[in-house]
Structures are given as C-alpha cells and as structure tokens.
Design a protein with these regions (language model features):
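N-terminal secretory signal peptides that target proteins for export/translocation
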Residues: 1-9
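Structured extracytoplasmic
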Residues: 28-188, 197-202, 207-223, 231-239, ...
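Intrinsically disordered/low-complexity terminal segments and short unstructured peptides
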Residues: 5, 18-21, 104
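Non-globular disordered terminal and juxtamembrane segments underlying protein topogenesis/assembly
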Residues: 192-194
C-alpha cells in the first residue's frame, strides 16, 4: 500500500465510557475567540505580570475545573465526526500567497466503532519551495486535540498570569511549562486562555517540545502554534483553527511559510450521551 493510501486509511480508535451522563441542552452556542485575519502577523506571547491581581475564583480551583472539563471533552471528542482542511502557504514579500498546498479529509465512522480519515479532496499544490505530501504533515498527529487532562497536567508547572478579554469572552491566562522533557513524549510550552464562565480552554499559544527540541522536520518547519476552540454543544469546546508561521532557508534567502488547519462541521456520530463537564 502506498504512503498516501496509508495516510488516507489511517484508523483511529476511540474509547467510549460504559456509562456517561448527558450534557445540558444549550439554548445558544457561545461565540468563541475569532481567529486572526489571514494577513495578520504572527502572535506574540503575553509577558507575565510581576504580581497579577488574584482572580475571583482561587487559582487551584480554576486549574482543577478546566482540567476536569478537558477530560470530559476528550471523552466526548470520540463521539464526533468532522472535516479537516489543511492549507500550507508560501508568502511573498507583499504578504500574499505565492504558492499553496491544500487537502481536505473527513473523519468517517466504521461499523465497529472506530473511524478513519477519508480524503474528500485530493491534495492540490502550487508550492515552489516546500515539497509536501499529506504524510509530510505527520507531526500534526503528535499534537493531541485536548491535551490538558488531569493525568497530563501533573507533568506541568501552571502559573496564573492575569486576565484578558478575547472578543466576547472574559478569560484567565496561564503559563504552562513542562516540569521535565522526555525524548519520546512531546510536552506543550506556552500560554492558555480559560473562559471564566464554562472554565474551559478556548485558546492556546505555544510549541511542543521533547528532549531533542521542538517537533519539526525538514518538510514540516512549523514549531509555534496558535490554536482556537469553538463552542460545539453545551459546554463542549473543540479545536476549530490552528495557525503557525515560520520560514524556510533557501539559496535565495528566507521564505515565509504559513500553516492553517480548520476543523469544521462537528457532528455527533453516536446517540450515546457524553459526560457533562463540571459546573
């Protein structure tokens, strides 16, 4: 089987809880933070405040609640299907795309409860510098969609930075750094934004590191990821947008490259209810 076929037929196993509670029905989904415009400059990490004002909810309680909600949403994530659009651009000196690579997949359920990514649109490319196939983007598979569950958060130092308004959301900001890096396991290092109503993570900004450094390859130069989540149902917030800007060194100089991933059309793929996040 070709590498391309292997990618298209990659099977994902999802674990389902034997007994789960029901999410409360939501009259209206809450708008999440808006992704940046296509021509926006790369984001800058917010500097830590020397002594931020204490939040109205104790910091340990905020951390406990958002990590427990992350766990509940991770379980719920296995009962959804979605489309994924991956686009890579080479940017010219005027900030315009000079070449693109794009493909679209859909997570499709199987009768046995598993699912696979089915190719909806054949990869199209007009890139001049990068030589990409879908398999070139395999480092993306190492980035978990909902990584800050309690069992993983114990490996991090989580420090409260302050508050920030993200469009219509009021958020708490935390710096997250691994206590220790490992050779085989990647850890997040960066900043997360937590909604002050649902106590869920709505935005992350940072990179994934191992003992050997940041996750990247020659054909995947992207290291720093700006990720946004959207309110899918009730208090469920799933990733909807990821962006990374970097550069590639060529004989003609540095070439600006950009990665954008969009997750669209989240739909429940089973009638089994999902566990509700903590109130």
């Amino acid at each position: 089987m070709s590498m391309r076929s292997t990618f298209v037929l990659r099977v994902f196993a999802f674990a389902f809880a034997a007994s789960v509670a029901t999410y409360p029905a939501a009259a209206q989904l809450r708008p999440g933070p808006l992704p940046p415009p296509a021509n926006a400059p790369p984001p800058v990490v917010i500097p830590a405040e020397p002594k931020p004002e204490p939040p109205p909810v104790p910091v340990p309680e905020i951390i406990k609640r958002f990590s427990e909600n992350e766990q509940a949403m991770l379980v719920a994530h296995g009962s959804y299907v979605y489309k994924k659009v991956v686009r890579v651009e080479e940017i010219d000196d005027n900030g315009k795309p000079a070449g693109t690579f794009q493909f679209t997949t859909e997570l499709t359920p199987l009768p046995d409860g598993r699912a696979y990514e089915r190719e909806l649109k054949h990869p199209e490319t007009s890139l001049n510098v990068l030589n990409l196939e879908p398999e070139s983007l395999s480092p993306l598979l190492k980035i978990p969609p909902l990584p800050f569950i309690p069992s993983q958060l114990v490996h991090y130092d989580v420090n409260y930075v302050g508050t920030q308004k993200l469009d219509e959301l009021n958020t708490y900001i935390f710096r997250v750094e691994p206590k220790q890096v490992e050779r085989q396991h990647a850890y997040f290092k960066g900043v997360i934004w937590v909604d002050d109503q649902d106590f869920v993570i709505v935005k992350t900004l940072g990179h994934w590191v191992t003992e050997l450094g940041e996750i990247s390859t020659d054909n995947f130069p992207f290291k720093f990821f700006d990720t946004y989540r959207e309110n899918v149902q009730g208090k469920i917030w799933f990733p909807s947008y990821l962006r990374s800007d970097d550069s590639v060194n060529t004989k003609h100089g540095l070439v600006h490259v950009r990665l954008v991933v969009r997750w669209e059309d989240y739909k429940a793929r089973t009638a089994a209810p999902a566990p509700a996040p903590q109130q």
